[in-house]
Amino acid sequence: MKEYLSDYEEVLKEQQSSEDGLSSGEAEARLDKYGKNELEKGKKDSLFKRFMKELSDPMIIILIVAAVISGITAFYEGESFADVIIIMAVVIINAVLGVFQESKAEAAIEALQEIAAATSKVLRDGKQVTLKSDELVPGDIVILEAGDAVPADGRIIECASMKIEEAALTGESVPVNKIVDLLQLNSQKDVPLGDRKNMVYMGSTVVYGRGKAVVTGTGMNTEMGKIAKALSQAQDEATPLQIKLNQLSKILTVLVVGICAVIFAVGLMRAGISNETILSTFMVAVSLAVAAIPEGLAAVVTIVLSIGVTNMSKRNAIIRKLTAVETLGCTQIICSDKTGTLTQNKMTVVEHVADDEKLLETAMALCSDAELDRDSGEAVGEPTECALVNDAAKNGLPKPELEKEYERVGEAPFDSMRKMMSTVHRTPDNKIIQFTKGAPDEILKRCAYALRDGEKVPMTDQVREEILKNNKAMADRALRVLCASLREWDDVPQNTEPEYLEKDLTYVGLSGMIDPVRPEVKAAIEECREAGIRPIMITGDHKDTAVAIGMELGIISDPSQAITGAQLDDISDEEFKDRITEFSVYARVQPEHKVRIVKAWKARGMITAMTGDGVNDAPSIKSADIGIGMGITGTDVTKNVADMVLADDNFATIVSAVEEGRRIYANMRKAIQFLLASNLAEVLSIFFATMIGFTILQPVHLLWINLITDCFPALALGLEESEPDSMKRKPRDPKEGIFAGGMGFDVFFQGVIVTALVLLSYVLGHRMESGVWEFVNSPDGTTMAFLTLSMVEICHSLNMRSRRGSIFKLNSHNKFLYGAMLASLILTTAVIEVPFLASAFQFTPIDLEEYAVALGLAILIIPIMEVVKAIQRKTGK
């Protein structure tokens, strides 16, 4: 049964209730049948489950497998388990970091509980009682007054000028005038949620008047419950970063297996086949392959993302999921709620048309029930009336002062049939004046006069036509227009019936108001466009208002680029996917429309973000690649399903967050390239050494370089500033691989250069001690190769500050990188010079001449890369 299309008496009959409410016994039976009026709680992952999720990452699985194989190798060869301990320490630290960041998030659907009213006034056994809201059942009669939160969905059975704020549910900033009457079907044979004026919904708030409603839905059977269900059904999808790292993990897995196979085969060819040589060669191959895995990569990525989270929080963007940092950087579509996100969610008077503006402001403020709070200086009450009272106060007419001068002595309250209200006042000179405000067309029907040049003149057709023309011009700009009039009395009228008061009025003027756009939003949207990001406005508000706001902000240039939810219902999913680029403003939409819009963009392969503050935004926020909630005006529901929360509710903060996301991703690629080039050099060095027949470096040496020497500079690269044109470029293609843009070639070329320098240093190290040029097992050569590889990596980190730009032309300095280079150099020197460390690593003493040679070889990487970058810049590769 569609209650809003049925007479309330039919609804009472359907619910087997009456205007006196249910009996206590019947209510108790229904509570057993329907359950409590509460929303199902979302299941929260335990700390252990979150920890295990971190361990299921493919990169981490590779490390765990490496640790297991290292353990087996150490056990069979009777060696130390140091490698195992080091690798598992990396795994655990990485998982703890991930859990720590994401454990800051609150439970998602449980927050919906906080929106429901704590207690409700209900008729039971014909008497008014106050109950906990979770005890309500279908058929209960709920009494609603200004300030009450609506505890359940219901059909209105009694209404006295009741207005309800439904912005959190529908997105409309203007309170809805509620009625008892039956609604009429539209062309779509239904009535949108925001137009169901004879219904009340859980999660909304009564801001004016009073009424009664019969409960038609509780708990998960409310509109709020439908949203909660949609949230629980929405599935989390892998982010672009997760996809790329998974691809990288597969590549590394294949590479490691390949290394094992090649080294094992070469070892057997050289040593011959026997049980002993098979086992020993296999253990050597596996241990070297394990050591060649970039053990620090997962930790570096996690820490760089964590640093990005910290930086974003300083810019008022609170990240709830680490991977959201990178996703922001490739966002192509931002679907934004209008109310409270693009606009201020505060009705504001922006225009007057009056002969006497001071009189107009006085009339509007006095003929209102909103009050000016002395502490905050802001009006409190129904939003439209608050706008009028605030406007008067802003222009030197605070309502408390006006009320002292103009005592209210009579009134005819507002009702939705008349569309106006009247108040009668005694003036400072003891005269009686009546102010009437309301809908312009209704007020003008009752006006016999108009104020012109300070004089009261007859209301002619010409004057009326001029007023209506001004009214239309304001309405065409999506302003909500109210008209004020007055009537003078010789004495206080004893009859305050509207029919008696509201006639022979004198027109005073028009006030136009709107929920204004945030002042910084237009510039933020322009920045989004420069960054190749398309802003989309989605709202539950009327189409005319949405079009006006959209055109003012530059989101659309023509009304044809706007579409309503009802029109959207007439388009199939397939057709909508093809036509979605035609529309940038969506009006009169419901929650399911928002999810559909997000899914249509995603179906076209676009990385889509959704911002919003109301409960109605939550399902689409969860469906989007990145959901952005509002920290101040946002409901807990929205915040808890969002990937990012704007602490200042400022749309412009998104631009800063996008820039930070792009910076973090670019820096992460630099760090990944740096680490992989180092590991490739290690792999190639081991491969060539094995082919020739000597051991260049031991697994423990490689672990030290991977986790100590390389990690500090790699982390510091994550702190590089944004490139100057980062927000002038289009978002990168989310489908592009981790090695896109020539990174694969860069890794290979740099790995080859470093390999050549390391092999040369090995020969030089052996030659400087033995006087012979040869490739043989040599502790001196190994020590020299280790020192040179470490120093080359330290110097190469400078090259990685910019993948294509010359390091001598960078405008910024990275003091963290300089510190990281120094730390790596000190630790590298310590492991060679400190006796017990040198003994553990089987290093031989190094003199100053050898240090100078190693440093000279290391520095060569800088001019080599400068030449390569210059060629790449010239060729555009």
Task: Briefly describe each language-model feature range.
Residues 764:
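Short glycine-rich, basic-tinged beta-strand/loop micro-motifs
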Residues 771-772:
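Conduit-forming functional cores of very large proteins
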Residues 79, 746-761, 791:
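Alpha-helical transmembrane segments of multi-pass integral membrane proteins
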Residues 709, 754, 782-797:
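Generic alpha-helical transmembrane segments
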Residues 1-731, 736-739, 752, 767, ...:
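Conserved cytosolic headpiece of P-type ATPases
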Residues 287, 775-776:
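Juxtamembrane membrane-interface segments at transmembrane-helix boundaries in membrane proteins
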Residues 800:
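A C-terminal functional module that forms or caps the active site or interfaces directly
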